[in-house]
C-alpha cells in the first residue's frame, strides 16, 4: 500500500472514531424528530444512518 493510501485510511479511521464519540455524547445535529400524520406520536429520525451500518461496526472492531 502506498504512503498516500495509508494516510487516507488512517484519516478516515480517525474521523470515524471521532464521529462515533460525538454520536455517543449527544444526538447528532442531523437527527431531526418529525411527527407523523397518524395519531400515534411515532418519531422518524433522519440522518446518521450510516453510523449504525454493520460494515462500519465491523471496521471499528479491530
Swiss-Prot record:
GO molecular function per UniProt: toxin activity
Signal peptide as annotated in the record: 1-19
Misc. comment: Negative results: the mature peptide does not contain cysteine residue.
Name of the protein described by the UniProt record: Conorfamide-Tx1
Keyword Electron transport carried by entry: no
Biological role: This peptide does not show activity on human and mouse sensory neuron-specific G-protein coupled receptors MRGPRX1.
Subcellular location: Secreted
Propeptide: 20-26, 47-62
Tissue: Expressed by the venom duct.
Origin superkingdom: Eukaryota
PTM annotation (Tyrosine amide): residues: 46
Phylogenetic lineage: Eukaryota, Metazoa, Spiralia, Lophotrochozoa, Mollusca
One GO CC annotation: extracellular region
Keyword terms of this UniProt record: Amidation, Cleavage on pair of basic residues, Neurotoxin, Secreted, Signal, Toxin
Source organism per UniProt: Conus textile (Cloth-of-gold cone)
Similarity remark: Belongs to the FARP (FMRFamide related peptide) family.
Amino acid at each position: 500500500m502506498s504512503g498516500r493510501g495509508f494516510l487516507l485510511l488512517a484519516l478516515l479511521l480517525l474521523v470515524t472514531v471521532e464521529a462515533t464519540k460525538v454520536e455517543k455524547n449527544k444526538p447528532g445535529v442531523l437527527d431531526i424528530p418529525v411527527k407523523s400524520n397518524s395519531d400515534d406520536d411515532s418519531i422518524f429520525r433522519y440522518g446518521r444512518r450510516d453510523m449504525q451500518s454493520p460494515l462500519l461496526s465491523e471496521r471499528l472492531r479491530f
